[in-house]
């Protein structure tokens, strides 16, 4: 609360001043409200002068309430005010509502009221009238008083106003139901005053408190007149002191207790409760609502409590505790209060709720929306962040707060109750412009006394910042201000007292900031207060992230260390000055150096400004600088800028001389202009480097000069080229010099486009700077803002050449390009295609051009669309994988010449190697130049690679065993586990080989130093590799070598950092997280002359391209990469141009571990990559197959798990493996030389120890290992040739010493391996069980069960299979593999009975061809070349699986007839195994490495399944229907008889000769089951009566029965049958005989169309039959088959009667297709018209299927041409004359077959459902439908008599019949709707794996890996036993033929020419 400003004598003067300023004040307030209309002004404004009159007004005593009490005017005004209040409050300060007018009106009313009461105020005697008693008030208002005698107990219980009010209010309201709230409050106040005065227990203090409450209540409601001091003579106004107030807090209590002045005491205690609002659910409240009255009531009580607190000191503590609750209530005072002025929603989130109101503006906030957020509301007055920052712009009107109970006292102010600095209370100095308050001693410097006049706080006097701060760089403490001497003591002060202490200031923080839009040259220091005020968020974030007690240490952005910096400062005073001002605060010197000037502009005064790009900063940080700023080399760069403009624009555009400053004459050395016409013939060869290269100071190597000559010649010839020099031979330099030569010799002025990987662009920039100094090179990279700046300023000199903005637009045509070379990344070529594609490029250079190897990539396609005159591609690996990629490179270069990929591959497919190389050279000669280091540097130091085998440490062995044991289940799963889990295990084992600390468990247990790094000695001892590395590095350091250490794992690099710190070596590091600039800096530091760094740590893949570390001569590959190419690229960092020492490469490999095996496999992979030039085979050489993974994991495990004694014995006998792994830079194998030098053991092997296989490295062994003379140069030229050939990735044959021709011609790539399936079982079972016991024991009962990580969880794997296939897993894939696998195991006599014994013997003796081999440049799989593999696949897709006697049928096509039966069957087995192998079709190889060649499992399995079903169905009726479709074609005599008995004995027919034996039902149903399913007995063709159906009928079966009834059934029943069809269309098609001949077929096509649609809808997916749709209950097929038999019976009888030719055919589809309806209509038409053959019906469908069995899938023309199936041509005879006759016929056949295919699949699924005894719950909707069908039938039968009566003319019966028919129609339509939903609700057949309770992998393994199983006959349709007895006696496997995976087949026809 403010201190007193004036005494009572001054009040009249103040009133007079107030009246004089009345008009001015209202204007000001209105102005303030205008600003308030938008909540706050845009710019911060502080108007202390304007506040002054307001403050005077606040200090005056108001007299507006001095009307006579009880007068009507008074009451009406009060009510009016209340109405106004609720209206304004109801709007809640919605943003859409304007308050200005209302608030103005209110203020005008108040002003009028004040004027009206002015005279009374002046004449008042200043005495407060005695308040009226409650009785007087009630009598005056005409209310009934409440007479209640208070007892002693009441005085004890009603201790506060709230309790008293709650007790008495109901009594008053009961007697006066309509009492207004204002009067109720007044009466309650009076009653409380009287009650307190009469209280015998509390005495005078209670009375005083009661008086205060009553006074407060009256103030709120009736406003009793305030006392004003009597008028006195005006006196001269003294000089006003600045405002002060007593704050709250710990510092104020002592003062209050010691104060004698009661008034002051009260003021000190007075607290303004912080205002809260609750933003309502809606933004408007109803006027005078009851809830509003309740809130007003409660807030009035609280107000009363607040006012009473100022008097009652005893209650202050209690009230303080309640303040938080009180603050959350609304306070609605007399008629106007702050609620009307504050918004009803949070300023930040615009939402309502519990909000806190600002006391100095109309804003409101949630506690959590403040920054920083508050946990609870602060005490006292509170200003929002906006007010604290901008100052007060507005003050709320609180009229009632101005009136105090004791008379005229000053109004409560808005200033803070605590000091802003120390947050304590006490006597505070208040600012005149904002709510801030301060202690005098907290100011800096402190003030000795309260200043006179107006005082503004430091925040209000804080100077604004000169701009927007971009970032804070540093902070420091400032010097404190000088001490302030307090004046000399006065004469009345005792002289003995010491002189007063001078007031000392405190140091403040200041911050070094970078300004937005200004360069680092303009960085400056700003005060903390400035930052806090103008950048609050930035300041708070900086505070949160940094230590604000100690300034940060100096950060030398250049990376220089303190020592170097000191030396340089001593030598260079300019550097010293810059260091002191900038560099030490984290600013790099490069950031203050100009890279180039981009543009210029003139200001209004005509002064020039330049846009400057700074070095090492992106383009979006370019800044405009004035002309005369003092920056090094500024003048030179200005000269270069104007010179470049003149050069490019061809005119003198230099800066006018008047703008040049005196004494600053620019150098006038013009840039040399290139010649307009060529001055040198490009075809002329340079013998020495040209003059423009000499001027750069660089010297080209001879081979680089040769490359330049070749490029220039190619350019002259117009031949686009590939420069394919080996890595490290300077392709970049040759390219730059080539472009520079075109420019300097006048051939081309550009522009040139260079596209390179982002990581190498910095290197390109440097090389351009070095080798082409006259080129203007623009690097087009960076974010959108940077690229926008480049486009606007670097692409052209014209301002409007390109539209500005972040969006990319085309450049205007014929605009002068500003640059010579544009350097950009691959990605921006495609992203900013609009601008880059609009420029005509003179030359394109693509670095690392293997990015173009795929012509489908976006980069390839976009770049192809650019306008380019000449193309140059750079690549170190032109044939990285295969010829296809090379072709794409050539196709990109010259699409006119290379445009036929197939022809190109075919041309190089079948020629021998020598011819291939020669032809490749002839072809590539003009286009490609490739040199190797071995070619061009005969004297270049060689590189020698040594594989260093290392032992596992004890800790590593422990973890290695643990990993294998823990993953026992994944390893032991049959089939070898899945690939992902094996890879995970291998990665864990690789980690273990590197270091056990890579596992979190070991890392946690490891000893750690105080600084967080690992203890060095433990770190080294834990890893065998580190122990060796420690010894090696010590010697290498002593000998002066420098080392690169590569590792794949960045965490391993972290451990190596700790190791190097422990050893005390200095090092650098690069991994994937260290990007361009930082990476280059690290390289430069390492390569700097005299650099102290000894080691460079690199991650193998991040340390790849564009890194030159030739200063190192030793490379240690700590762990090998999966892909050997990555390791080669890694060590090429050191073995490159500039290397003058021999490079030693040490590859660490852990002995007898996965690492050793990986190294061997990787070498084989590399050889394979060279071998394979066929497309698709070599592209992912880094990936491992499953067999390889399993093999790698097994390597060394047996030895590891042996007991020590056993290990000693076995190791003593085992010969030590010699080193076969040493390689030199010349290529080739140095095994021989290694043996010569090291004997039979590698270096480090200690031969004296009996345990000879354990490697010990002593000093002698280390010295031997590091000996750099171990080199092999015996056959250098041969090795050169080898490396040259291998660079082309051509095959290198392994020539054996034997003379066998076949062995030389066939290179065996991979042989099938016989693996022990129980390897892991034997090795790990015991350890695994032991570990499980230990775990169980350790975890104990009731403890947490640790989850075992099983990488090969069977349930998870099953789920994957189910997702990929469908829910109803078929047995096909499993059984087929089992059958096919037995080709190799079964005795030949069983499978090949027809072969001669000699042939069998030769086949048996002859070994199978290798799994993968290469013959004459072609890959063979089990001896099958590409053509034979294609022929086999075509046969499968045509006829399905080969039959048992495939060798004697035409299934064996011409291409396959040269194969022996053993080879053929082995390939069938392999093929089926591949089909059963899970995995993506997109993979390039199967698990065993055999190429996929685009095979789609889904399509092949689908085709096999469909063909199997068709064949089975034809064989089912073949013995009845015969072999010929028409009787007249059957030959007479014994041939005909024979054909009736044995069908398909034609050797051209692939169907087996014994159909009854080979093709029973698909699930191998026994005879009994077949009989139950309604199959006819083949032995007794006459016995064709159907079996009796079971009792319960399912819906589809019943529908079938209704439809299949005799033709003489009543029309009503026919109609009913039609309506009951589940998927039938509304209108049945007209019968064919009613249509003209031409319309029959189109009508059928329409029907088929509808059928197709209904099929798609019924199964939900057109490409995959869902089992839900087909699994009906078991009774369905029984009924359906019965109907089929009836139809067959009828049909047979008709045929017997008519042509004595029996025919029988049916498909029991259960009513799920429209087939039977179609047949019914067609047969009716055929029989009635007598055209049995001319109208297509059931008979034609059978012969169509028979033709497909004979001729294959979709061979429509062959089928029609076969005389046996002539019936199929009959319906089309009338259409022969039409032009599209063949097409129409084939289309009909295809669509008809599609329908039959659908029906066959559904029949198969229904049969399976019946076989598995699948039943439905009686409550299932399907069963409910059955009951409803019975209801329909009953209703129809019971009203049949109505039909007869209606026909007889009975009108009442007719009416009833109509009702019955309507009822039937409704029932049927409901049923039809239910039927469509039925398929999704039917039972599911569980997958095979679920039924067997085995995983897919287990089933496959059981079928393939057990040699002792019974043999199984081959053939998809043989009567073989599908499962062996291993599955138990009760298991009944499916019969033969039922093994097709029908669920996963898309049901569409595959009408393709196969």
Swiss-Prot record:
Where in the numbering of this chain does the Chromo domain appear?
497-554, 592-653
Q: Where is the composition biased (Pro residues)?
A: 227-237
EC number(s) on file: 3.6.4.-
Enzyme class, one word?
hydrolase
Tissue specificity: Preferentially expressed in total brain, fetal brain, and cerebellum. It is also moderately expressed in the adrenal gland and detected in testis.
| Substitution effect: residue 272 to V | In PMNDS; uncertain significance
Result of changing residue 1390 to R: Abolishes methylation by N6AMT1
Could you state one GO cellular component term attached to this entry?
Answer: NuRD complex
- Mind telling me how this protein is modified after translation? Methylated at Gln-1390 by N6AMT1.
Q: Where are the zinc fingers (PHD-type)?
A: 343-390, 416-463
List each coiled-coil range: none
Which GO molecular-function terms appear in the entry?
A: ATP binding; ATP hydrolysis activity; ATP-dependent chromatin remodeler activity; chromatin binding; DNA binding; helicase activity; histone binding; histone H3K27me3 reader activity
Q: How does it assemble?
A: Component of the nucleosome remodeling and deacetylase (NuRD) repressor complex, composed of core proteins MTA1, MTA2, MTA3, RBBP4, RBBP7, HDAC1, HDAC2, MBD2, MBD3, and peripherally associated proteins CDK2AP1, CDK2AP2, GATAD2A, GATAD2B, CHD3, CHD4 and CHD5. The exact stoichiometry of the NuRD complex is unknown, and some subunits such as MBD2 and MBD3, GATAD2A and GATAD2B, and CHD3, CHD4 and CHD5 define mutually exclusive NuRD complexes. Interacts with HDAC2.
Q: What is this protein called?
A: Chromodomain-helicase-DNA-binding protein 5
- Please tell me the species this chain comes from: Homo sapiens (Human)
Q: Which gene encodes it?
A: CHD5
């Amino acid at each position: 609360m403010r201190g007193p400003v004036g005494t009572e004598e001054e009040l009249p003067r103040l009133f007079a001043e107030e009246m004089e300023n009345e008009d001015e004040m209202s204007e000001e307030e209105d102005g303030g409200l205008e600003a308030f209309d938008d909540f706050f002004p845009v710019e911060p404004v502080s108007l202390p002068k304007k506040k002054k009159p307001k403050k005077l007004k606040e200090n005056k005593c108001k007299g507006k309430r001095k009307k006579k009490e009880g007068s009507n005017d008074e009451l009406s005004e009060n009510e009016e005010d209340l109405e106004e209040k609720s209206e304004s409050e109801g709007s809640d300060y919605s943003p859409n509502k304007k308050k200005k007018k209302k608030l103005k009106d209110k203020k005008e009313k108040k002003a009028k009221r004040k004027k009206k009461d002015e005279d009374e105020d002046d004449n008042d005697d200043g005495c407060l009238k005695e308040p009226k008693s409650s009785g007087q008030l009630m009598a005056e208002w005409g209310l009934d008083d409440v007479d209640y005698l208070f007892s002693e107990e009441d005085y004890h219980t009603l201790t506060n106003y709230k309790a008293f009010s709650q007790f008495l209010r109901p009594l008053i309201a009961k007697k006066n139901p309509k009492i207004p709230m204002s009067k109720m409050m007044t009466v309650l106040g009076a009653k409380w005053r009287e009650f307190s005065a009469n209280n015998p227990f509390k005495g005078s203090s209670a009375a005083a408190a009661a008086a205060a409450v009553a006074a407060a209540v009256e103030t709120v409601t009736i406003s009793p007149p305030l006392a004003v001091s009597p008028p006195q003579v005006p006196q001269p106004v003294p000089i006003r002191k600045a405002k002060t107030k007593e704050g709250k807090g710990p510092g104020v209590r002592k003062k209050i207790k010691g104060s004698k002045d009661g008034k002051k005491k009260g003021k000190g205690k007075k607290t303004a409760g912080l205002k809260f609002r609750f933003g309502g659910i809606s933004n408007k409240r109803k006027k005078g609502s009851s809830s509003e009255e309740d809130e007003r009531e409660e807030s009035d009580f609280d107000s009363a409590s607040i006012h009473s607190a100022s008097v009652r000191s005893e209650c202050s503590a209690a009230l303080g505790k309640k303040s938080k609750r009180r603050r959350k209530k609304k306070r609605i005072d007399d008629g106007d209060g702050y609620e009307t002025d504050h918004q009803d929603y949070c300023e930040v989130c615009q939402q309502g709720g519990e909000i806190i109101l600002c006391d100095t503006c109309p804003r409101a906030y949630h506690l959590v929306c403040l920054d920083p957020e508050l946990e609870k509301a602060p005490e006292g007055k509170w200003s929002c962040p906006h007010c604290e920052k901008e100052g007060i712009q507005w003050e709320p009107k609180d009229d009632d707060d101005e009136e105090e109970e004791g008379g005229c006292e000053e109004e409560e102010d808005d200033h803070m109750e605590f000091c802003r600095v120390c947050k304590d209370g006490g006597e505070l100095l208040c600012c005149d412009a904002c709510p801030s308050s301060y202690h005098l001693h907290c100011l800096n410097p402190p003030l000795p006394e309260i200043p006179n006049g107006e005082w503004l706080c430091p925040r209000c006097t804080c100077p604004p910042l000169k701009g927007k701060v971009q970032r804070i760089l540093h902070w420091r403490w400032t010097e404190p201000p000088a001490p302030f001497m307090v004046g000399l003591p006065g004469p009345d002060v005792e002289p003995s007292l010491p002189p007063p202490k001078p007031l000392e200031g405190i140091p403040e923080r200041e911050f070094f900031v970078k300004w937005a839009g200004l360069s680092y040259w303009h960085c400056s220091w700003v005060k903390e207060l400035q930052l806090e005020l103008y950048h609050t968020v930035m300041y708070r974030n900086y505070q949160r992230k940094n230590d604000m007690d100690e300034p940060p240490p100096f950060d030398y952005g250049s990376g220089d260390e303190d020592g170097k910096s000191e030396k340089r400062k001593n030598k260079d005073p300019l550097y010293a000055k810059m260091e002191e001002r900038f560099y030490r605060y984290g600013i790099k010197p490069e950031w203050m150096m100009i890279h180039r000037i981009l543009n210029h502009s003139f200001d209004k005064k005509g002064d020039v400004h330049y846009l400057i790009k700074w070095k090492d900063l992106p383009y979006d940080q370019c800044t405009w600088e004035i002309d005369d700023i003092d920056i090094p080399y500024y003048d030179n760069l200005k000269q270069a800028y104007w010179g470049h403009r003149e050069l490019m624009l061809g005119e003198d555009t230099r800066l006018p001389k008047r703008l040049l400053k005196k004494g600053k004459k620019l150098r006038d050395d013009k840039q040399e202009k290139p010649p307009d016409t060529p001055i040198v013939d490009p075809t002329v060869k340079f013998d020495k480097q040209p003059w423009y290269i000499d001027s750069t100071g660089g010297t080209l190597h001879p081979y680089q000069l040769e490359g330049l000559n070749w490029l220039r010649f190619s350019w002259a010839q117009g031949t686009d080229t590939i420069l394919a020099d080996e890595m490290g031979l300077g392709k970049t330099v040759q390219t730059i010099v080539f472009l520079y030569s075109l420019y300097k010799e006048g051939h081309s002025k550009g522009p040139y486009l260079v596209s390179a990987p982002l990581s190498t662009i910095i290197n390109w920039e440097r090389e351009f700077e070095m080798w082409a100094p006259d080129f203007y090179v623009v690097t087009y990279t960076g974010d959108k803002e940077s690229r926008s700046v480049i486009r606007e300023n670097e692409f052209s000199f014209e301002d409007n050449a390109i539209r500005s903005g972040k969006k990319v637009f085309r450049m205007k045509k014929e605009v002068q390009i500003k640059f010579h070379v544009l350097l950009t990344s691959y990605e921006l070529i495609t992203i900013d295609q609009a601008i880059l594609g609009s420029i005509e490029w003179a030359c394109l250079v693509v670095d690392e051009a293997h990015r173009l190897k795929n012509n489908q990539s976006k980069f390839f396609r976009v770049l192809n669309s650019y306008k380019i005159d000449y193309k140059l591609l750079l690549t170190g690996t032109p044939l990285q994988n295969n010829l296809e990629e090379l072709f794409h490179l050539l196709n990109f270069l010259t699409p006119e010449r290379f445009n036929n990929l197939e022809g190109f591959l075919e041309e190089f497919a079948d020629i021998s190697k020598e011819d291939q190389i020669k032809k490749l050279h002839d072809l590539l000669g003009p286009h490609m130049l490739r040199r190797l280091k071995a070619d061009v540097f005969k004297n270049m130091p060689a590189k020698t690679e040594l594989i260093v085998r290392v032992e596992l440490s004890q800790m590593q062995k422990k973890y290695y065993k643990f990993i294998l044991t823990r993953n026992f289940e994944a390893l032991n799963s049959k089939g070898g586990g899945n690939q992902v889990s094996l890879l995970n295990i291998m990665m864990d084992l690789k980690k273990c080989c590197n270091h056990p600390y890579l596992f979190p468990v070991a890392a946690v247990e490891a000893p750690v130093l105080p600084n967080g790094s690992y203890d060095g000695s433990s770190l080294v001892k834990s890893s065998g590799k580190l122990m060796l590395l420690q010894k090696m590095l010590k010697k290498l350091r002593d000998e002066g070598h420098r080392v690169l250490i590569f590792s794949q794992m960045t965490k391993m690099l972290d451990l190596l950092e700790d190791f190097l710190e422990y050893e005390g070596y200095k090092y650098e590091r690069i991994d994937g997280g260290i990007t361009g600039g930082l990476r280059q800096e690290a390289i430069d530091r390492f390569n700097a002359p005299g650099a102290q760094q000894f080691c460079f740590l690199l991650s193998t893949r991040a340390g790849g391209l564009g890194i030159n570390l030739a200063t190192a001569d030793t490379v240690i590959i700590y762990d090998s990469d999966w892909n050997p190419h990555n390791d080669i690229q890694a060590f090429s960092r050191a073995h490159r141009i500039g290397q003058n020492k021999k490079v030693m490469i040490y590859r660490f490999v852990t002995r007898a571990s996965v690492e050793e095996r990986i190294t061997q496999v990787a070498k084989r992979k590399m050889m394979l990559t060279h071998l394979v030039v066929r497309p698709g085979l070599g592209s992912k050489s880094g990936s491992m197959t499953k067999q390889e993974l399993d093999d790698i994991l097994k390597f060394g495990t047996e030895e590891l798990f042996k007991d020590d004694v056993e290990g000693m014995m076995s190791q003593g006998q085992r010969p030590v493996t010699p080193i076969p792994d040493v390689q030199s830079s010349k290529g080739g194998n140095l095994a021989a030389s290694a043996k010569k030098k090291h004997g039979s053991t590698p270096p480090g092997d200690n031969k004296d120890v009996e345990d000879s296989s354990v490697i010990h490295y002593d000093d002698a062994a280390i010295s031997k290992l590091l000996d750099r003379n171990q080199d092999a140069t015996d056959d250098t030229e041969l090795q050169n040739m080898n490396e040259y050939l291998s660079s082309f990735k051509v095959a290198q044959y392994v020539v054996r010493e034997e003379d066998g021709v076949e062995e030389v011609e066939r290179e065996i790539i991979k042989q099938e391996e016989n693996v022990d399936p129980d390897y892991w079982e034997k090795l790990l079972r015991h350890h695994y069980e032991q570990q499980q016991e230990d775990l169980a024991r350790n975890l104990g009962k009731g403890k947490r069960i640790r989850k075992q990580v099983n990488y090969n969880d069977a349930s998870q794997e099953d789920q994957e299979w189910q997702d990929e296939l469908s829910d109803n897993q078929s047995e096909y894939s499993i059984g087929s593999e089992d059958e096919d696998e037995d080709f190799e195991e079964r005795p030949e006599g069983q499978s090949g009975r027809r072969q001669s014994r000699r042939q069998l013997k030769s086949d048996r003796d002859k070994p199978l061809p290798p799994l993968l081999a290469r013959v004459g440049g072609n890959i063979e799989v089990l001896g099958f070349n590409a053509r034979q593999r294609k022929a086999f696949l075509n046969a499968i897709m045509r006829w399905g699986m080969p039959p048992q006697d495939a060798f004697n049928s035409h299934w064996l096509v011409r291409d396959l007839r040269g194969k022996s039966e053993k080879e053929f069957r082995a390939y069938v087995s392999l093929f089926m195994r591949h089909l059963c192998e899970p995995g993506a079709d997109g993979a390039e190889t199967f698990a065993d490495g055999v190429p996929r060649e685009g095979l789609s499992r889904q399509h092949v399995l689908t085709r096999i399944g469909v063909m199997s079903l068709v064949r089975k169905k034809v064989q089912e009726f073949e013995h009845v229907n015969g072999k010929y479709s028409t009787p007249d074609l059957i030959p007479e005599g014994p041939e005909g008889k024979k054909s009736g008995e044995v069908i398909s004995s034609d050797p051209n027919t692939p169907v087996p000769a014994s159909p009854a034996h080979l093709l029973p039902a698909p699930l191998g149903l026994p005879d009994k089951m077949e009989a139950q399913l309604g199959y006819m007995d083949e032995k007794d063709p006459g016995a064709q009566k159907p079996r009796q159906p079971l009792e319960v009928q399912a819906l589809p079966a019943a529908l079938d029965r209704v439809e299949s009834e005799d033709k003489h059934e009543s029309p009503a029943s026919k109609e009913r049958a039609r309506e009951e069809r589940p998927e039938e269309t509304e209108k049945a098609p007209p019968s064919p005989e009613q249509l003209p001949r031409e319309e029959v077929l189109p009508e059928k096509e329409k029907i088929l169309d509808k059928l197709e649609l209904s099929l798609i809808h019924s199964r939900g997916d057109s490409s995959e039959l869902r089992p839900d749709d087909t699994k009906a209950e078991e009774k369905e097929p029984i009924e359906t088959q019965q109907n089929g038999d009836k139809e067959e019976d009828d049909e047979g009888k008709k045929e017997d009667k008519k042509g004595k030719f029996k025919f029988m055919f049916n498909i029991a589809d259960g009513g799920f297709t429209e087939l039977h309806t179609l047949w019914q209509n067609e047969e009716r038409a055929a029989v009635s018209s007598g055209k049995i053959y001319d109208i297509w019906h059931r008979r034609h469908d059978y012969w169509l299927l028979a033709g497909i069995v004979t001729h294959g899938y979709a061979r429509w023309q062959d089928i029609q041409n076969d005389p046996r199936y002539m019936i199929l041509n009959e319906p089309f005879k009338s259409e022969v004359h039409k032009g599209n006759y063949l097409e129409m016929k084939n289309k009909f056949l295809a669509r008809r077959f599609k329908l039959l295919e659908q029906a066959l699949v559904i029949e198969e699924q229904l049969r399976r459902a019946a076989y598995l005894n699948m039943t439905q719950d009686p409550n299932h909707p399907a069963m409910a439908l059955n009951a409803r069908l019975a209801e329909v039938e009953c209703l129809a039968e019971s009203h049949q008599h109505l039909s007869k009566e209606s026909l007889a003319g009975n009108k009442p019966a007719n009416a009833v019949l109509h009702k019955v028919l309507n009822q039937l129609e409704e029932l049927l339509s409901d049923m039809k709707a239910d039927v469509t939903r039925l398929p999704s609700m039917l039972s599911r057949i569980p997958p095979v794996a679920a039924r067997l309770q085995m995983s897919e992998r287990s089933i496959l393994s059981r079928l393939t890996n057990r040699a002792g199983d019974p043999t199984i006959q081959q053939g998809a349709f043989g009567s073989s036993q599908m499962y062996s007895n291993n599955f138990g006696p009760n298991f009944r496997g499916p019969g033969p033929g039922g093994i097709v995976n029908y669920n996963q087949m898309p049901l569409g026809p595959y009408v393709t020419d196969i």
